[in-house]
């Protein structure tokens, strides 16, 4: 082998067993030969004349080398090209490699280097080409192509910035939603507190007006109980009155509360009215409810709402029970006996009275299932010829419609 591998595919394109350097004359055959070479993949010349000059197969295997047998001109076959774009520098290196190969051929191929140590100018290891006799063209690689990317270098930074902007936008929207919900809740609570304060102020004004009337009656010598009766007629709730007395130049923090009852005795009313007059004379009366009244009123409103909801549930349940009772009365109406000799009356309800079924009556007193004759007999009427004449169906009450 002399250190060179043998090209086993070199003779497929030629199709003969003759010596390598012998050129056999081309024989035109009427029948078209089977195309076995790779002319289609190598860009073969196929036009109107399909039996024209065929192209020699070029090997793309870099490990196949053949020793040149005789010096000859450079091969005239077409070289295998690469799909990568070629540059001017690669073309210049290719021409230089052809010149070097022409200079080395007379030496008998002793200076041939392994294919693994050389790369073609096109940048592909399979871009070397050889003719049908196994000659291979080798060129030195002078310039290399830079590896390119399908995405620009700064696209990752843009994506990261876009994701950060989206996350910030989501956080802003969430914060605004929470603030809006909190503001709605606070507005509702403020409105409720304001309404409670307005009601309390209105009640305090009414109490002050009643106290002024009572004081005027006391000064003019009128009947004091008349003002208390008027205060009772207004239907106002018990008023919490806190009085502060000046002792030793400072205000004492012990309030005195007077709560007149709606239905009290005359002695209690006479005891409370002079104390109120004394407060007005001293000028230290303050007709403002205590601070805890606000919390008490809020709790009362909450309990009232709960009672209303419970009442609504009870009403709905009663309505549903009324519907069930009405349906039961329509399906199983009540009956009773009438016109019996002993005058006894027994009540029951129809259990079966549909067409094709035997009528059954359930006795209320015992819960027995009886026929009409047995029901009349159970009432003490005995055996009668037509028991249905002694049984009356009670009408459904109008409240169940």
Curated annotation (Swiss-Prot):
Keyword Nucleus on entry: yes
Swiss-Prot/TrEMBL induction comment: Induced by abscisic acid (ABA) and drought stress.
Subcellular location(s) of the protein: Nucleus
Xref: InterPro entries: Ninja_fam, Ninja_motif, NLS_NINJA_AFP-like, TDBD
Pfam family, one: NLS_NINJA_AFP
Polar residues composition-biased segments: 217-226
Gene Ontology annotations of biological process type: negative regulation of DNA-templated transcription; signal transduction
GO cellular component, one term: nucleus
Family: Belongs to the Ninja family.
Function: Acts as a negative regulator of abscisic acid (ABA) signaling and drought tolerance. Mediates deactivation and degradation of BZIP46, a positive regulator of ABA signaling and drought stress tolerance. Represses BZIP46 activity via interaction with the TPR3-HDAC1 corepressor complex and down-regulation of the histone acetylation level at BZIP46 target genes. Promotes BZIP46 degradation via interaction with the U-box type ubiquitin E3 ligase PUB70.
Protein name in the entry: Ninja-family protein MODD
The encoding gene: MODD
